[in-house]
């Protein structure tokens, strides 16, 4: 459970989201059972990061960064329907090992804000291991580094649908851009906006949206 002051000790957060091939990250046991010549296919095809900087009692957005990623593998057609990213769009995109130093530099020592954080954590762990930066089965970032807006939203709004779009609708955040397709930077941006409002709700019991948006 998140306490009202759980972010008070931080001056910088990083909101993160990834778009993927639609495949789940296999567990370490599966990977270890594969033949020596087996090459782990990539999963992440786009990353989006939003820097959040302390601004008085709240937060402001700082640097943003996103990149597409060539997974060297197929993309599930159902995933393409969601994010609209096709293999041809990634032909000249960097591989994950190429952007990995930038990922590590951007995150630094800051907490990572994500919606349904276990998915994003698993994707990062897989790609870090695939790049031979960490062993299979280990984590790129400790679990306590993650702040999950889905968990916080469920804490404040028990029983509500917890998807990113539903959360934004409940918080009166415009999520209409997601109607056509998802994107890593867009989703990271909405996750950052949601955290700002959810923290305010947790601390003060306030609606995050201006009164004129919520009055009937």
Feature-to-residue mapping (PLM):
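Short, P/G- and charge-enriched loop/turn segments at secondary-structure junctions
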Residues: 2, 32-38
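Walker B beta-strand of ABC/ABC-like P-loop ATPase nucleotide-binding domains
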Residues: 15
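Short acidic, Gly/Ser-rich segments with clustered Asp/Glu that frequently serve as metal-coordination loops
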Residues: 18-28, 35
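Metal-dependent phosphoesterase signature
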Residues: 80-100
């Amino acid at each position: 459970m998140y306490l009202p002051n759980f972010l008070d000790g931080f001056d910088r957060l990083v909101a993160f989201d990834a778009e993927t091939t639609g495949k789940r990250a296999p567990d370490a046991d599966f990977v270890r059972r594969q033949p020596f010549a087996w090459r782990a296919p990539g999963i992440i095809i786009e990353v989006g990061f939003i820097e959040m900087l302390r601004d008085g009692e709240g937060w402001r957005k700082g640097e943003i960064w996103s990149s597409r990623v060539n997974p060297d593998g197929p993309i599930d057609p159902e995933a393409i329907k969601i994010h609209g990213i096709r293999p041809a769009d990634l032909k000249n995109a960097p591989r994950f090992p190429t952007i990995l130093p930038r990922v590590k530099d951007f995150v630094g020592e800051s907490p990572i804000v994500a919606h349904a954080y276990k998915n994003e954590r698993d994707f990062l762990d897989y790609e870090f291991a695939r790049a031979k930066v960490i062993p299979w089965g280990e984590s790129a970032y400790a679990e306590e580094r993650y702040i999950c807006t889905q968990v916080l939203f469920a804490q404040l709004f028990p029983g509500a649908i917890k998807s990113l779009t539903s959360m934004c609708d409940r918080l009166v955040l415009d999520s209409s851009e997601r109607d056509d397709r998802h994107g890593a930077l867009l989703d990271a941006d909405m996750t950052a906006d949601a955290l700002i409002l959810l923290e305010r709700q947790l601390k003060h019991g306030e609606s995050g949206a201006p009164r004129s948006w919520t009055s009937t």
